[in-house]
Amino acid sequence: MLKNDLSGARVVAVHAHPDDEAITTGGVLADLAARGADVTVITCTLGEQGEVIGETFAQLVNGDADQLGGFRIHELYASLEILGVRGIHLGGAGCWRDSGMVGDPANEHPRAFIHSGDRAVEQLKELLAELKPHLLITYGPDGGYGHPDHIRAHEITHAAAGEQRILWAVSDREELEDGLKAITGLPEGWGRGELSAVDSVDLSVELNDEVYATKVESMRAHATQLWIADGSVSRTNPVAAHAVTQQDNVKVWALSNLIAQPIMRHEHYQLGAGTPLPEGATGVLDGLEF
């Protein structure tokens, strides 16, 4: 793989909250940037409704100090720096608020992203007119796991896009289940649960060791939200977690719900719109001219 072989390519990923860029697309974004592509992550909210892992900053949550969104800006930009990509907040930081899950009282907040309407579409159109991406990455119609903000990110991306290829970040069920079966020991308090995945994908992008390590570090930057069970600790979460997996080159992680899952060695995509992927494609830009 040659450095700068993607020079001239422009890619925009539209994500709902800080940490989504790392979890769902961190490997691909890091690889694109390392190979010379111009990569921008547009984040639509500050993730104010998130829970917090660890006691250090637990009182930042919405029900207490309601300062989590501001804190997560710093986590986001640490992650983006690790990935080597640019970051933009849709409408400016704080324009749109995390809507929470369906039924959350946060759904009724006047700045909740689910109420963003045509204004958010126009904001994204203006950014895309400036950035001129060859490729857009976001989620599928269900947002990946049903979060209203993820669904809204999908909606505004398709509404604002021109004729660019749009890829939806998904999880391949077979690889996910193989990774889950390989986990033979869980940290104390962690468990197993249902995880969202799809039965078929249009593209699987393999993450080499360097890219995989970069993705893991970008995820680690979101320490209030993600816990990686490799014995590491941080100021945010000084408690180490250890998982046992039969896949030596795969790490195990969890959100605040402590449902264990593998950080898979591939990132998976479905074609949402635009130029089809050529047969045998191995990269998100395959078949595009730039």
Swiss-Prot record:
Please name the Pfam families in this protein's record: PIG-L
Name the Gene Ontology biological process terms: mycothiol biosynthetic process
Which annotated residues bind Zn(2+)?
H17, D20, H150
Keywords attached to this Swiss-Prot or TrEMBL record, sorted alphabetically, are: Hydrolase, Metal-binding, Zinc
Q: Tell me yes or no: is Nucleotide-binding among this UniProt entry's keywords.
A: no
Domain of life where this protein originates: Bacteria
Q: Name one GO molecular function term.
A: zinc ion binding
Task: Name what cofactor the protein needs.
Answer: Zn(2+)
EC numbers for this chain: 3.5.1.103
Gene3D superfamilies, per the entry: LmbE-like
- Co-factor binding details: Binds 1 zinc ion per subunit.
Substrates-to-products reaction catalysed: 1D-myo-inositol 2-acetamido-2-deoxy-alpha-D-glucopyranoside + H2O = 1D-myo-inositol 2-amino-2-deoxy-alpha-D-glucopyranoside + acetate
| Family statement | Belongs to the MshB deacetylase family.
The function of this protein is:
Catalyzes the deacetylation of 1D-myo-inositol 2-acetamido-2-deoxy-alpha-D-glucopyranoside (GlcNAc-Ins) in the mycothiol biosynthesis pathway.
Q: What is this protein called?
A: 1D-myo-inositol 2-acetamido-2-deoxy-alpha-D-glucopyranoside deacetylase
Which organism was this protein described from?
Corynebacterium glutamicum (strain ATCC 13032 / DSM 20300 / JCM 1318 / BCRC 11384 / CCUG 27702 / LMG 3730 / NBRC 12168 / NCIMB 10025 / NRRL B-2784 / 534)
